[in-house]
Amino acid sequence: MTTITTAQIKSTLQSAKQSAANKLHSAGQSTKDALKKAAEQTRNAGNRLILLIPKDYKGQGSSLNDLVRTADELGIEVQYDEKNGTAITKQVFGTAEKLIGLTERGVTIFAPQLDKLLQKYQKAGNILGGGAENIGDNLGKAGGILSTFQNFLGTALSSMKIDELIKKQKSGGNVSSSELAKASIELINQLVDTVASLNNNVNSFSQQLNTLGSVLSNTKHLNGVGNKLQNLPNLDNIGAGLDTVSGILSAISASFILSNADADTRTKAAAGVELTTKVLGNVGKGISQYIIAQRAAQGLSTSAAAAGLIASAVTLAISPLSFLSIADKFKRANKIEEYSQRFKKLGYDGDSLLAAFHKETGAIDASLTTISTVLASVSSGISAAATTSLVGAPVSALVGAVTGIISGILEASKQAMFEHVASKMADVIAEWEKKHGKNYFENGYDARHAAFLEDNFKILSQYNKEYSVERSVLITQQHWDTLIGELAGVTRNGDKTLSGKSYIDYYEEGKRLEKKXDEFQKQVFDPLKGNIDLSDSKSSTLLKFVTPLLTPGEEIRERRQSGKYEYITELLVKGVDKWTVKGVQDKGAVYDYSNLIQHASVGNNQYREIRIESHLGDGDDKVFLSAGSANIYAGKGHDVVYYDKTDTGYLTIDGTKATEAGNYTVTRVLGGDVKVLQEVVKEQEVSVGKRTEKTQYRSYEFTHINGKNLTETDNLYSVEELIGTTRADKFFGSKFTDIFHGADGDDLIEGNDGNDRLYGDKGNDTLSGGNGDDQLYGGDGNDKLIGVAGNNYLNGGDGDDEFQVQGNSLAKNVLFGGKGNDKLYGSEGADLLDGGEGDDLLKGGYGNDIYRYLSGYGHHIIDDDGGKEDKLSLADIDFRDVAFKREGNDLIMYKGEGNVLSIGHKNGITFRNWFEKESGDISNHEIEQIFDKSGRIITPDSLKKALEYQQRNNKASYVYGNDALAYGSQGDLNPLINEISKIISAAGSFDVKEERTAASLLQLSGNASDFSYGRNSITLTTSA
């Protein structure tokens, strides 16, 4: 390699000037004029561009000679510094890697770094695209680079001048339209200079154009260009993205500048063709189209291309909305790319592919939109210039024609560019499917499901504990994914995509079980045929549909053209009308069908119904049903069916015709106010330029049945217990034992024959046991509980409840009021009545009844009609805490509260008609024995004597309970406890050996009183 010294360069500088001048002259008058004008404008702007050569620098090859010669010809000052290169870089550039620096002398180009760049220039040129590798054919490599630097500097300065004028005008300064027009023309000239210095070889660019010559052939002044553009390759074969845009724009620019021999420099400038190089693709995409579009969208000027014009007053009717939409495309592409990172790790790169599509088409869109905007700006600028006679009218007319042609070319090319990018993405998908032998979009759903399992592991792994089983079998539906659907539409693969995919996963002991080939011998889940088989399971199992599962069947898709640019992929479902479930055979299981979609809309408010047929095993099973019909064959064990986990309509359960225990027909009306899961067909529309793709897919809605009433029918076999809905349900029991739960709502529950257990739960319910020994539980709400024939246990729960028992003298009934103001009506038999908390009415009837009262209860009224052995247990009260007083025919018992016993405040018991003795009245309203917690007894006779004694000797109308004792001790409680146990045992078939809540509630308390006594030591007050 030859080494050249600074001295040698100085000695040959004079001859180099002449050589460079000749070379510049041969480049063409247009280029020479442009470059000289650029140099002049740079100097006029008051800035100097300097090529700085340190004294110790030795150039390589002949490139330094070229630098010096061309710099001199271009008017760039060459300076030699006495300092060495290291000192200069430290002082001016800060680092030896920088090419350009700013000093007090001016903008400085560091020769050693530029020389290094020249050695790599050929390689760089090949990368830049278009005809960039031919840059500098007439001026040399050095001239191309230096003139580019110079013209960029001039462009920046010209743009700044426009910015200053615009800012001045916005702030109220006096700026005329002619000043703006002149500044615009100056900027246009600068851009033309840049184009001319780079794109002076038309042959290298014209080969890239599409067959657009026919459009231009008949245009005046441009027929030469049109002829040159005939018979060129199709645009679909040109590279995608910015390379495509750059190639087209470079070719158009070079052709218009150099092919029209009759056009002078001013005409070329007025035409504004060179402004199409705004995207600067042929200088390595040095200025980002995205940044330009964003700045323009924000109303800001830039120093790149003609972006300053966008914000200027001469721009007419330029809408920023187009730029905003482009900016949004890039934002969305970035979000999709960010979203894609997780799924790449899970084996799916479709999201990244979609992001790349939006970035490439967004770049094309940004470029073409920006160019169209600039062309409109140029036309406006030239028109403004024409009004001030800066250019002639013919030039102004030519501008409109040329810019219109270019806009048409770009618009015609846009769709082809978009489709080329889409085809690239489609090729990637096809290649992946060929390699892996699998549907690409199905793989996307697999990745989505893997992420779902990761995100929800804590919930999924705890289901077995929640449902008290050993194993959870969880079926999950991954529903339609809009990004997957969008990619399918973009790549014309709508017929290959899926509405989603369903999965089955297994969990035990908080861990997910991997599906091994030898672990699960048969296909457990077949969503195409609608089969689920758990018969091989050896563990207690939960079958749960975690997300709404689409109806079983096969999807068939067909993509067809529906318009010039419109396509639709239509969906046909070859559905199966039944889910068949084989349950766990020897262990208890839970089957949660509440998320199973059983209604599919097929158009015109018509519905297809999918039934559930469930064959359970011999364990104790639980079944949660959905809104559709079902056949449940429960098998052995104690099996429970639930209707309350989702909206299952208005429920009627009928066992009146059953010939075997556990058989019921369940009718459900899905009225207009009932919301159910419905499968529907929806469409996603995707646009690729002018092309639109509609893809149909299955989804679901939780919605009303459009004002119509649908009736569903369930057939239940060998089901021991039923739980109703949240609505007002009707239950009609069989002649066998029925166990019904009303759940929420105001329910009507009739047990009919058999020993039934009826639960009203929430709501104002009516429960009737019918014949048999029944147990009725009202639950929350104001309930009515009716015990008919047999021995009945009635528990009202919370609320103001009413109890009725209708048995004969042999009947034994338990009536427990619970909280609230209750009314308890006994039968002719022996009844146990406990009003519970609240102010209650207790009417035992004609039998020998037992009443129970605790200190925490409210004011009770006992209206006993008969019986010669009625008893009252004051289970946790001592007689020293009460007093008795006669009021008319009633006997009032007052109890102490807070060590105060207040006569006149009815807080204990009123014994209605205790003293009533009418002629011929066989009724007996007295309670024959009143027990306190210690077993001491007051009888009607002992109470009568005590009251008479107090009235006679103390002139008092009341008597302490302790002064009315007849007899009794702790041992006298045993017979009472035995009687209570017999009634409880008979009522509702309670086994007294078992720990029954109801029985334990009715046991008598043997605890000591909370009060501390002397004899009648509590404070006694009287009140009116």
UniProtKB/Swiss-Prot annotation:
Residue positions of covalent lipid attachment, annotated as N6-myristoyl lysine: K564, K690
Keyword Secreted: yes
UniProt xrefs under SUPFAM superfamilies: beta-Roll
Outcome, altering K690 to R/A/C: Abolished acylation by HlyC and subsequent activation
Principal location listed in the UniProt entry: secreted
Cross-referenced InterPro entries: Hemolysin-typ_Ca-bd_CS, Hemolysn_Ca-bd, RTX_C, RTX_pore_form, RTX_toxin/Mannuronan_C5-epim, RTX_toxin_determinant-A, Serralysin-like_metalloprot_C
UniProt entry keywords in alphabetical sequence: Calcium, Cytolysis, Hemolysis, Host cell membrane, Host membrane, Lipoprotein, Membrane, Myristate, Plasmid, Repeat, Secreted, Toxin, Transmembrane, Transmembrane helix, Virulence
Post-translational modification: Myristoylated by HlyC; the toxin only becomes active when modified. Mainly myristoylated, while a minor fraction is acylated with pentadecanoyl (C15:0; 26%) and heptadecanoyl (C17:0; 6%) fatty acyl groups. Fatty acylation is involved in binding to host membranes and promotes the irreversible insertion of Hemolysin into the host cell membrane. Can be activated by both myristoylation and palmitoylation, but HlyC catalyzes lysine myristoylation.
Pfam families for this protein: HemolysinCabind, RTX, RTX_C
Molecular function as annotated in GO: calcium ion binding; channel activity; toxin activity
Region (Disordered) residue spans: 20-39
Keyword Manganese listed: no
Known role: Bacterial hemolysins are exotoxins that attack blood cell membranes and cause cell rupture by forming a pore.
Name by which UniProt lists this protein: Hemolysin, plasmid
Species the sequence originates in: Escherichia coli
Lineage: Bacteria, Pseudomonadati, Pseudomonadota, Gammaproteobacteria, Enterobacterales
Annotated gene: hlyA
